[in-house]
Every structure is written in structure tokens, then in C-alpha cells.
């Protein structure tokens, strides 16, 4: 029976082959060669189109396609470019006039110490930032001059040093190691749950810390799981540094919506996880609204899928540990949370170190080693570097160490008490203005607010005219202030000016001369995000 079935099947296959060959004999060999190749090519195109639609959404793809067709019409592209230039000119707000006397060649004869006088004159053109800027400068009060003086002395002592030369400048190498260790101790390195291997390096800022964490996670996941088409998932409140990292390292980035409380949506994050996912992200707190994401839940999610989980503590690293000690109800956020593999912390924000100092921390050395770049085949010798920069300013490392050692735990506790109390007072004051609403429930020192009754960007323009420098946000349209020690004595002034700004917009709605409300409003509503992207690039290009 088996032999009969086999012979019958063989006979049927021979007959089918003969019939197929007979039919195909009607076509030229070249056609038979091209058809499968063209089919494969079309399949790849269709697959790519579906991938783009899946990533960007059907609406965004259609808008982009239509705008591309419109730009092909004679005159349309020129019109768009002209309108774009008008917006760029308005955004510059007179900064072009400051470029008229720009020095472009070396002076024939050096200025000597006179250069300091020239620098003092230039400094007078800076905006008045004392107490008026959101974030930006984090030290304040009567003690600020003393702190600045101490930092400047520390930086001056080590202005010639470079941690790249480990054998020469052992002092700043030690300083860096101790800054990392002290920062890690604030974030759970001494707790059993951390695993006892927390390590890291200093970087130039929060962006480099995040970029390095992404790079290390990508390479670690390639080593552990063989992932070659990496993807990462971040909440839409996640910092734009992740977009940079995604562009630099060819990682597909998924931005998922936040929940109704403006925290990372764990369920939405889970839905986007697949076999190519290398990492997920949380913030403590997020830059836009000062709200801490559900770090514990995200940590469990990362653990269950065996992927990396980075926590952005650039703002909260030198506040949340002390706020918790002061009795504030702070949800878990550090290495005590299982699943957290890396953390970024800025020392130059609430750590009160000189600008250009941050840290990136890892749960263990196995992950961190993927941050390093080692070169063995260079004619210049064997080379290894821990961060993106080769040479690094040892002066900033020394300044950060001096800031942390001079303030100590007591100093940071006192500072945290002041700014947390100021933040709560400011938040309560904003809530009392009926035309405004506070976004979510801020966990730290950022208060974001919008309005259903007014154009919030017009309110921002009025505040700008009063000397305040606040941050404009989108989705929803809003503005925020990041409270620092600079703001502790001026909370009442801020609330008074804010009430007046609201009343002014109520009485006279509409943009003010030179205001940016129309631009912010239009950018938020513009469906073609590619055009907004071009606008931002044109503006940045005009600044340098």
C-alpha cells in the first residue's frame, strides 16, 4: 500500500511538472527571470510602506504624502520657504543684530588681560535670570556667591587636567570615582536589592548620560539576545535625548501616550514590546509636568521580558532622596526597584555643580562595559575611552566633587526643604486662579499649567514681557516653571504677575506685538510635523 501511494504521488508530481513546464514554455526565459524578482521587489516596498504606516500612523503618512505632492507644484515650495523664513526671523527676536560685530578672525595683537573687560561687556547682554528663569540656574539666595566662588576656585585649580590621562591626573580620576559613588549611594547602591555592583561615569550632561545608557543597552541586548534591529519604547513625556540616541544609533523609537494622570502608561508600553525591544524608559520626574512615572510597574515589565529599563533622574536625582527623608511621599524610583538597569542623574542641576556635569549609572559592570569603546588596531597605540568625549575637562569633575563635599547631606536637605515648600506654595497659588488648571499632581519641583478659557501661550507672552522665562509645552498646550533656589523668595511675585497676565489676556485676547503665541499655537496644530521639523532646523541653523 505504501509503495503504491509513493509511486502514485511520484507519477502525479511528474505529470504536474510536465504540465507546468508546458505552460511556462509559452513565456520568454527573461520574463520568467524578471517576474519573481519584480514580485520580491514589490513585496519589499509594500512591507516598507506598511512598516512606516505602522510607525507613524496612517494620518501622518497621508498628510506627508499630500504635502510632498503639493511641494512639487511650481511656486509652492518657494512660498513655503518664504513663510518659514518669516517665522525664523520672528523667533530670532533681534538676535541677528548681536551678530553684526561678531569676531571672525584672530586679533593681530592679543588683547591680554583686556579680554576680561570685553567679556564683562558681553555678559551685560545676557537676560536677567536671577529669580526669573524656569530652571537654568539652580543656586540662589545669600549663600550663592560663596558657593560660586568655591566652585570657581576648585575649577581653576584643575583647569589644566584631563581625566583621559589616568596615569597623569590621578586626582581628578579619583574625584570622578567618588562623585559617581556618592551619587549611586543616594540612589540605592547600599541597599541589598541593588546587587552591590552599581557603577558608572561622569558625562557632560543629561543628554550624554541618556545617549550612553541607550548605547550600552543596545549593545548589551545584542550580546545577550542577538537583537540586530533594536527598538525602544518611551512615554511621550520622555526627554528628547532619546530621539537623539535613536537617530545616532539607528534604533526604532516608539512614543506611547501617557495615562490620564500624565504618567507612563504601562499597558501601552507592554503592547509595543516585541522580540526587537531592547529597553523601556521611565522618568522621575518627567521634564514636562514634574510627575514620576510608575517605576515599580515598569521595572516588573522589564524583568518579565528580560529587557533593559532606564530611569531618567536628571532632575530628581538630587531632590527625591532628600525629599523622602524629609517625609514627602515619594514613590520608588531608584536601584532598589528590581528591573532598573541604568539611571541618569545631573549633578549640575540640583546638585549645584558647574554646568557640564552629569552621571550615568548601571546596575552592574556587565552592562557598563558595553558603554566603553576600545580600539586595538590604531597606529597611535591601544586606545580605550569610557564616554563619548575623549578629552574631558577635569576642572568640571573637580567642581562637581567640591560642590557635593562642601554641601554634604545637611546642605542638600536644607535646599530640598526650601524648594519643595516653594513648589507647593506656587502650585496652590496657580490652582487658585480659576482660569488655569495644573496638569496632573506634580511630585517634585515642576508646576505645569494650562487653560481652557484662555490661550495659554498669550499668557506666556505677557509673563515674558514682565521678565519671566518659562517653558512652553504641547499636548496639551501649557507652560511650566521649574522651581529652584532662585525662586524661593519670589513665589508671591510670580503669582502676582501670573494673575495680572491672566487678567490682561481676558480683557484683551489676541497676540501681543512681538509675542510668540501665534507660532507656538500654529506649530501645535500643524498636521505636517515634517514641516515643523524643518522650521526648527532652520531656526537652529540661523543661530550659528
Curated annotation (Swiss-Prot):
List residues traversing the bilayer.
30-50
GO MF: pyridoxal phosphate binding; sphinganine-1-phosphate aldolase activity
InterPro entries named in the record: GrpII_AminoAcid_Decarb (IPR050477), PyrdxlP-dep_de-COase (IPR002129), PyrdxlP-dep_Trfase (IPR015424), PyrdxlP-dep_Trfase_major (IPR015421), PyrdxlP-dep_Trfase_small (IPR015422)
What Enzyme Commission number(s) appear in the record? 4.1.2.27
Q: What is its main location?
A: endoplasmic reticulum
**One annotated Gene Ontology cellular component of this protein:** endoplasmic reticulum membrane
Null mutant phenotype: No visible phenotype under normal growth conditions.
Q: Which cysteines are joined by disulfide bonds?
A: none
Q: What is this protein called?
A: Sphingosine-1-phosphate lyase
Source organism (scientific name): Arabidopsis thaliana
Q: What is the lineage of its organism?
A: Eukaryota, Viridiplantae, Streptophyta, Embryophyta, Tracheophyta
Q: Which gene encodes it?
A: DPL1
Amino acid at each position: 500500500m505504501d509503495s503504491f501511494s509513493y509511486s502514485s504521488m511520484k507519477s502525479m508530481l511528474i505529470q504536474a511538472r510536465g504540465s507546468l513546464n508546458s505552460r511556462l514554455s509559452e513565456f520568454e526565459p527573461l520574463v520568467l527571470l524578471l517576474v519573481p524578482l519584480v514580485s520580491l521587489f514589490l513585496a519589499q516596498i509594500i512591507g516598507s510602506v506598511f512598516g512606516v504606516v505602522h510607525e507613524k500612523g496612517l494620518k501622518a503618512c497621508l498628510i506627508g504624502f499630500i504635502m510632498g505632492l503639493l511641494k512639487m507644484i511650481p511656486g509652492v515650495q518657494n512660498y513655503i520657504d518664504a513663510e518659514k523664513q518669516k517665522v525664523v526671523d520672528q523667533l530670532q527676536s533681534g538676535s541677528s543684530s548681536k551678530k553684526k560685530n561678531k569676531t571672525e578672525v584672530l586679533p593681530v595683537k592679543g588683547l591680554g588681560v583686556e579680554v576680561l573687560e570685553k567679556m564683562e561687556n558681553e555678559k551685560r547682554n545676557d537676560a536677567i535670570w536671577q529669580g526669573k528663569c524656569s530652571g537654568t540656574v539652580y543656586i540662589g539666595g545669600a549663600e550663592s556667591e560663596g558657593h560660586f566662588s568655591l566652585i570657581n576656585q576648585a575649577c581653576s585649580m584643575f583647569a589644566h587636567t584631563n581625566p583621559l590621562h589616568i596615569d597623569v591626573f590621578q586626582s581628578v580620576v579619583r574625584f570622578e570615582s567618588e562623585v559617581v559613588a556618592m551619587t549611586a549611594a543616594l540612589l540605592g547602591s547600599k541597599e541589598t536589592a541593588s546587587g552591590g555592583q552599581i557603577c558608572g561615569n561622569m558625562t557632560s550632561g543629561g543628554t550624554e548620560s541618556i545617549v550612553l545608557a541607550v548605547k550600552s543597552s543596545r549593545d548589551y541586548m545584542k550580546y545577550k539576545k542577538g537583537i540586530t534591529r533594536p527598538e525602544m519604547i518611551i512615554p511621550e513625556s520622555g526627554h528628547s535625548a532619546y530621539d537623539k540616541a535613536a537617530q545616532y544609533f539607528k534604533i526604532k523609537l516608539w512614543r506611547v501616550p501617557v495615562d490620564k494622570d500624565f504618567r507612563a502608561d504601562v499597558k501601552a508600553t507592554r503592547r509595543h514590546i516585541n522580540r526587537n525591544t531592547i529597553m523601556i524608559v521611565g522618568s522621575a520626574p518627567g521634564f514636562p509636568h514634574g510627575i514620576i512615572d510608575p517605576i515599580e510597574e515598569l521595572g516588573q515589565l522589564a524583568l518579565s521580558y528580560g529587557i533593559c529599563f532606564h530611569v531618567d533622574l536628571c532632575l530628581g536625582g538630587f531632590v527625591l532622596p532628600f525629599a523622602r527623608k524629609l517625609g514627602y511621599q515619594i514613590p520608588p524610583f531608584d536601584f532598589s526597584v528590581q528591573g532598573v538597569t541604568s539611571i541618569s542623574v545631573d549633578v549640575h542641576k540640583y546638585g549645584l555643580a558647574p554646568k557640564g556635569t552629569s552621571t550615568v549609572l548601571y546596575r552592574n559592570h556587565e552592562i557598563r562595559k558595553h558603554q566603553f569603546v576600545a580600539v586595538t588596531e590604531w597606529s597611535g597605540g591601544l586606545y580605550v575611552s569610557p564616554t563619548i568625549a575623549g578629552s574631558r575637562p577635569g576642572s568640571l569633575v573637580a567642581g562637581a566633587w567640591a560642590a557635593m563635599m562642601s554641601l554634604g547631606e545637611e546642605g542638600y536637605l536644607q535646599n530640598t526643604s526650601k524648594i519643595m515648600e516653594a513648589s507647593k506654595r506656587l502650585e496652590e497659588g496657580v490652582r487658585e486662579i480659576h482660569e488655569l488648571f495644573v496638569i496632573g499632581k506634580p511630585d517634585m519641583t515642576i508646576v505645569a499649567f494650562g487653560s481652557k478659557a484662555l490661550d495659554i501661550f498669550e499668557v506666556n507672552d505677557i509673563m515674558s514681557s514682565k521678565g519671566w522665562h518659562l517653558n512652553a509645552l504641547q499636548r496639551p498646550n501649557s507652560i511650566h516653571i521649574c522651581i529652584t533656589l532662585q525662586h524661593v523668595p519670589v513665589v508671591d511675585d510670580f503669582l502676582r504677575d501670573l494673575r495680572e497676565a491672566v487678567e490682561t489676556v481676558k480683557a484683551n485676547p489676541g497676540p501681543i506685538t512681538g509675542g510668540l503665541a501665534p507660532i507656538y499655537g500654529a506649530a501645535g496644530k500643524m498636521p505636517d510635523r515634517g514641516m515643523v521639523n524643518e522650521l526648527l532646523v532652520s531656526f537652529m541653523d540661523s543661530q550659528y
